Design a protein with these regions (language model features):
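Conserved ATP-binding subdomain of kinase catalytic cores across diverse folds
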Residues: 3-219, 224-304
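ATP/Mg2+ or Mg2+-diphosphate-binding catalytic cores
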Residues: 307-345
Length: 345
């Protein structure tokens, strides 16, 4: 579909529900129509290095995958996959089932949730407590254990892959210098050999963890914005469906995103509460090496967030992006200082 077609559907309310006009939220890979009762996600016809939505058949497949995978943690939120068909009035509608009309695209049908209950918003309001973190751990630990990958069925990234992923930040040294000062490019130069050394020292342990069953077919994008904290319990949504390689990972890498996000938001005690509760349910940290790996993965997740914030700041020069960059820079510096003290030990 095109943006024009999607916006026409939204304006006309041509979808299941009350029929009022919907708000359209656009990302680089999808449009999401937010109605009063429901939300509908339509995938853009794009092919990128990490996904392929270029044909209707591919989009239909990944819509079904999105519903299937997200029902693991949000069964009441992900309702179905609906077809998009032309209407007799010359427009298009979501949810028609007219066998005489062609299906031109597909939409993921979701229950509309209360955005004010998103965890990132609640963290900024100081409205998240230890009980919320315990409830989240009680949801995620059994989920991860149930989706652990058997030894021999998963081959993790190579040492070169790990380094290349982290080193993606380093070409942003000039932008980082403009925003964060001279300390940023100096730190990047220091971190390059540190990361190489760390990966060389710990890659064998990562392989051992694969054999020990600590890699999972998980969520893949586990951060606070993808969590609703509801009265009846947490709902974790919007997992990665389009590339299983981004979803199959060491559980420490999965948890690191959430822990880093909470720590970057200035609530390290809540991160500790979550990890303690989680480890009681699944002791996936067996030795000190694993603690160091968790810090490395937190550093990697902060690295990626910093890079995105630098990109947004360079393009838009907005203070919000600058604040996010400073926020992630702060926690990244702390993680890397910890690794510098422990690498080689």
């Amino acid at each position: 579909m095109t943006a024009e077609q999607v916006h026409l559907i939204a304006r006309r309310g041509a979808y299941p529900g009350t029929g009022s006009a919907a708000q359209v939220v656009e990302t680089h890979i999808s449009w999401v129509l937010l109605g009063d009762e429901y939300a509908f996600k339509i995938k853009k016809p794009v092919r990128l290095s990490f996904l392929d939505f270029s044909t209707p058949e591919q989009r239909a497949f990944y819509c079904r995958e999105e519903v299937r995978l997200n029902r693991r943690l949000a069964p009441d939120m992900y309702l179905d996959v609906l077809s998009v068909q032309p209407t007799s009035s010359g427009g298009w509608a979501i949810g028609l089932t007219d066998p005489e009309r062609p299906v031109i695209d597909y939409a993921v049908w979701m229950k509309r949730m209360d955005n004010s209950r998103q965890m990132d918003i609640l963290l900024r309001q100081g409205a998240v407590g230890p009980a919320d973190m315990a409830a989240l751990a009680a949801l995620l630990a059994p989920f991860h254990r149930a989706h652990a990958l058997a030894a021999g069925t998963f081959v993790g990234p190579t040492a070169d892959d790990y380094f290349a992923d982290f080193a993606d930040l380093f070409p942003w040294a000039t932008v980082a210098q403009r925003l964060l000062g001279d300390a940023a490019p100096r730190a990047f130069e220091t971190w390059r050999p540190l990361v190489l050394r760390f990966i060389a020292d710990y890659h064998a342990r990562l392989h051992t963890r694969e054999q020990r069953g600590f890699c999972v077919d998980g969520h893949g994008d586990l951060h606070a914005r993808n969590i609703f904290l509801l009265t009846q319990g947490p709902v974790v949504f919007d997992c990665i469906e389009f590339n299983p390689h981004l979803r199959r990972l060491d559980v420490l890498n999965e948890l690191a995103f959430l822990l880093m996000d909470v720590e970057a938001g200035g609530r390290p005690s809540l991160a500790e509460d979550f990890l303690k509760a989680y480890l009681k349910l699944w002791p996936c940290i067996e030795e000190q090496e694993d603690e160091h790996l968790l810090t490395y993965f937190k550093a990697y997740r902060a690295n990626v967030r910093l890079k995105i914030a630098l990109l947004q700041w360079e393009q838009e020069q907005q203070e919000a992006a600058a604040q996010r960059a400073r926020q992630y820079w702060g926690v990244l510096e702390n993680y890397m200082a910890y690794l510098a003290l422990n690498v080689g030990r």
